[in-house]
């Protein structure tokens, strides 16, 4: 069984130390997970960095930031999705690992989604991701987190900007084509709309101009013309994400198998659009702009034909508040994997799904706070889109 892992780093995992390796190995050895579907399924979760949902055309945004995805059939956008943290280490941790509504998770004794899939009979797992710049932390993080997924490969950008997410596409095509005959999970982890925005897309995707964005501090005049350049550049990152996701969908379509794609952003972004003119993310008091994230599903015709019930349940949950932690259990159900770690009340593909009544998030002060209120203006825009899609 082959696992190709190109990964990115987070110092927090490296600081946990090598002693975590033995604990994770013991957990992996005792995992139970079985694929029950007679169908051959290819699943592709895509973790995107830094994307505020209300800058997406699919959520009613006034700009065409999703011109390709907007034309896609079999695509379900979840407009009321919230993250669990406004910084990547905590938020992605709760996407890859099973977490409860109180946000509790211990990654040293909780199986990663990819590990459960790897344990399932006849299912392989591949993870391809962009990387951070510090190779020392990358190596430690990869050794600890992906220790049970076989061979590791590091694509590093030691002295230059991290390449745009389109660099993932050749690997995605190669892996999907090579595994088109079997159950397969491909995880893509991009850098999305993370700062510096102009580095996150090629020139051909600089459609909103001017976009010569530069960071100059947190205290600015709300009428400063430079703010619009920042917002233009951020919208260009979403335009590029639209291109990347549409390209992956085309690859999945071409393989002709039952397949699905799930995209979820780890957190949103402040671009001088809060009352106290915040910029970037990981603020000490989490904002709506950081909390409201993009979440979507795409399904092939073949998948819908054989798994219509699961797809219909996901559509039913478009109109209620959901959280990024739901992705873990939803993917397990879309793959029809049986494991004690599966919780149907946290799967959007289940009729037993329970709405999150008390949404919470970790903020930059490393504290849990209530999720910020959803602005009425944004809610009205989203509701109009949902009404038009009926």
Give each language-model segment a name.
Residues 117-122, 244-257, 298:
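A structural motif corresponding to the C-terminal end of an alpha-helix
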Residues 48-50, 241-244, 259-267:
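Conserved beta-strand->loop/alpha-helix structural units within folded catalytic cores of enzymes
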Residues 329, 335, 339-390:
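Phosphate/adenylate-binding glycine loop and adjacent helical scaffold
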Residues 104-110, 228-239, 282-291, 304-331, ...:
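A short beta-strand-to-alpha-helix junction
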